[in-house]
Amino acid sequence: MDKINAVITGVGGYVPDYVLTNDEISKMVDTTDEWIMGRIGIKERHILNEEGLGTSYMARKAAKQLMQRTKSRPDDIDLVIVATTTSDYRFPSTASILCERLGLKNAFAFDMQAVCSGFLYAMETGANFIRSGKYKKIIIVGADKMSSVIDYTDRATCPIFGDGAAAFMLEPTTEEVGIMDSVLRTDGKGLPFLHIKAGGSVCPPSYYSLDHHLHYIYQEGRTVFKYAVANMSDSCEAIIARNHLTKEEVDWVIPHQANQRIITAVAQRLEVPSEKVMVNIERYGNTSAGTLPLCIWDFEKKLKKGDNLIFTAFGAGFAWGAVYVKWGYDPKEDA
């Protein structure tokens, strides 16, 4: 019997209509467009500013487009995995809400929380469900409403993040394409350097936590930069070596869109030319679990069947890794 692997058969994406520019950010905090572009590489970010809408709204938009592009019916879907840090509620899962809003009757669903590395983890998890032979169509979504956890009086974090979502369809294949390998790692020593202190069981919501802005992202940028560059580079090197690829055989590197300086440093350490590195941070900012699939959403028409793609990310935890994908289809007319 031929070995079953999981192949990406389509992509869908969504970003909100409202665009928050650097000029607007500079009216909120002491910064400038020149500083943000020079230090972070972001020109604008999309924000979901309609009251009462959360991460599931963006996830539904992305998944709906994905289902249309792959001609998938609601009853075809077996599993939904949503990688997110900004779930609609503490419970139930955003994935369960998404199932209801897509009209999925035969699927089970769960959220995956690995912050900016969440989509990497979802890719490998979804692929293993496909490889089991029991599941035929799996939707994996990376979606975050980062504006809901940003302090817009904090100049260190508020220029960085945006809102967005994108989704992949995973299906079985016996061809030599698909999600080929992964290197995934976690090290809990990263907790002090990147976290949201309040809102969990250690520090439940209180007047104190609200007054002291403890429900927003805290980040020590220099430490995160150092660990991100080293670990993203190392995991890429490991997966390239393990799969006997040369640097020339790598067609695309898809790095988490955290900071342009991180992206550039990783590419330089890997000795990969800039034209092989997917970058869209200038338009979207850091959408956390959304960055990797949003890159594919933007660059899909440039991909060819058989292209070697290396996805890599780093996030709070610390959590990081790389996933090797051999792309499964040529450009589609409706993509």
Curated annotation (Swiss-Prot):
Signal peptide: none annotated. SUPFAM superfamilies: Thiolase-like (SSF53901). It catalyses: malonyl-[ACP] + acetyl-CoA + H(+) = 3-oxobutanoyl-[ACP] + CO2 + CoA. Pathway: Lipid metabolism; fatty acid biosynthesis. Residues 257-261 are annotated as: ACP-binding. This is Beta-ketoacyl-[acyl-carrier-protein] synthase III 1. Belongs to the thiolase-like superfamily. FabH family. Catalyzes the condensation reaction of fatty acid synthesis by the addition to an acyl acceptor of two carbons from malonyl-ACP. Catalyzes the first condensation reaction which initiates fatty acid synthesis and may therefore play a role in governing the total rate of fatty acid production. Possesses both acetoacetyl-ACP synthase and acetyl transacylase activities. Its substrate specificity determines the biosynthesis of branched-chain and/or straight-chain of fatty acids. It comes from Bacteroides thetaiotaomicron (strain ATCC 29148 / DSM 2079 / JCM 5827 / CCUG 10774 / NCTC 10582 / VPI-5482 / E50). GO terms for biological process: fatty acid biosynthetic process; secondary metabolite biosynthetic process. The active site is at 116, 256, 286. Homodimer. The gene is fabH1.
